[in-house]
């Protein structure tokens, strides 16, 4: 019976009932094997890209494309890292309800920065040769940038999402996690791509007198790619991620197939339109299109905010189900369905030491997983074994409750210092008068 139950849990993407010792949990963890495969692959990608981009390239017409030197790469990385930090923080913040491990965030970012750029460089270069790009003129690569690069780049950036879904299944990947991980992959891709563009601009302006002021030229491209159009890659990859997120919560097999495909088609179409307008129009004529793109970014942001609000309502309803059954306390429904109360508990736990913070974070993760598992049972998107998993989560929550922060009412983020009370003066009895 135990083997049948474990088999059902594995097929449903649920963790095993008896995880065993730490070494067995480590060997069973998909993230271990994914990391052991991807990290060497990332290192190879970066080294190979460096070897490809460093030497000068001479074209058949005699023109030369200067290679990237170490000084240019260091300066370009300095300018590119700030945009990557801002967008990475935003997507990590989005992954708040069932947050992934930091290693998963790093792998998603590394896939976009290393693997996706390596794949795109090879396929886009091959496509450019097939389309007879025979000069160093940037206008010669317009057709590959419009008709080839969007398909290649969007597919390569989203590949990490499919890999994680295949290995993790329903165990850890939630709908907002898919969007966050896809965004991190896009941020990594844009980070390395910006390094290449900034580095080429630095090398070109330093070796070409006609380019004018090198610093002004570099600042111009940094503002263009790092500020004004920095939303492009994350926005397109979010479309594919949203399609996958819809597929995760759907019971229909038809929706599970068509939703990711529709998201990918929208991402490719938007990418093609963006590259086409950027390649065929001057910067003065792109102001109206830029405002339209900002409107689309605002629409996607508003959609995510509404989705977060709807997600909190779902968590609240599922926690109410457990409260009616007597498995949770009344305040659990109010506290853990509010993002702001959860943030306060996190901050208060951090200020009270690593042990308190760890127990509080684990408590919130367990109670959120309990609500998600209940929602999957109601929607029919999880197989047998989920009921047994809910009982395990309830027992783990009750065991952890005495050591975790569970009530923000009256709780100060920074604990008050206990002032030592003055030691009372000793009082000696007065001897009676004779």
Protein language model annotation of sequence segments:
Residues 1-434:
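Hydrophobic alpha-helical segments at protein termini of multi-pass membrane proteins
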């Amino acid at each position: 019976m135990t083997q049948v139950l474990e088999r059902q849990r594995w097929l449903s993407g649920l963790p095993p009932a008896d995880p065993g010792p730490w070494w067995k949990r480590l060997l069973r963890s998909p993230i271990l094997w994914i990391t052991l495969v991807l990290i060497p692959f990332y290192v190879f990608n970066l080294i190979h890209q460096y070897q490809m981009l460093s030497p000068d390239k001479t074209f058949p017409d005699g023109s030369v494309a200067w290679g990237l030197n170490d000084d240019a790469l260091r300066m370009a990385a300095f300018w590119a890292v700030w945009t990557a930090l801002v967008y990475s923080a935003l997507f990590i913040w989005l992954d708040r309800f069932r947050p992934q491990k930091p290693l998963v965030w790093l792998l998603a970012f590394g896939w976009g920065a290393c693997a996706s750029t390596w794949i795109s460089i090879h396929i886009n270069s091959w496509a450019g040769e097939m389309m007879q790009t025979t000069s160093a003129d940037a206008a010669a690569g317009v057709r590959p940038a419009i008709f080839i690069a969007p398909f290649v780049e969007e597919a390569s950036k989203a590949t990490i999402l499919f890999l994680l879904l295949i290995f993790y299944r329903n165990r850890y990947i939630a709908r907002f996690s898919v969007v966050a991980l896809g965004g991190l992959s896009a941020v990594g891709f844009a980070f390395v791509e910006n390094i290449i563009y900034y580095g080429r601009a630095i090398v070109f302006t330093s070796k070409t007198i006609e380019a004018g002021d090198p610093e002004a030229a570099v600042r111009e491209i940094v503002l263009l790619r790092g500020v004004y159009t920095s939303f492009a890659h994350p926005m397109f990859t979010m479309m594919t991620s949203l399609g996958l997120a819809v597929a995760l919560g759907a019971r229909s097999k038809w929706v599970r197939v068509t939703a990711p495909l529709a998201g990918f088609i929208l991402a490719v179409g938007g990418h093609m339109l963006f590259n086409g307008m950027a390649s065929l129009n001057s910067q003065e004529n792109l102001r109206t299109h830029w405002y339209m793109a900002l409107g689309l970014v605002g629409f996607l942001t508003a959609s995510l905010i509404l989705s977060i609000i709807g997600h909190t309502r779902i968590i609240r309803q599922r926690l109410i189900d457990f409260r009616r059954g007597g498995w949770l306390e009344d305040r659990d429904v109010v506290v853990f369905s509010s993002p702001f109360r959860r943030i306060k508990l996190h901050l208060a736990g951090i200020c009270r030491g690593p042990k308190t913070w760890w127990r509080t974070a684990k408590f919130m993760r367990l109670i959120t997983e309990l609500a998600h598992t209940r929602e999957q049972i109601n929607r029919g998107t999880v197989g047998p074994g989920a009921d047994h998993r809910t009982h395990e989560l309830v027992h783990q929550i009750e065991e952890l409750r005495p050591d975790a922060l569970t009530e923000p009412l009256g709780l100060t983020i920074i604990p008050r210092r206990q002032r030592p009370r003055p030691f009372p003066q000793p009082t000696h009895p007065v001897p009676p008068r004779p």
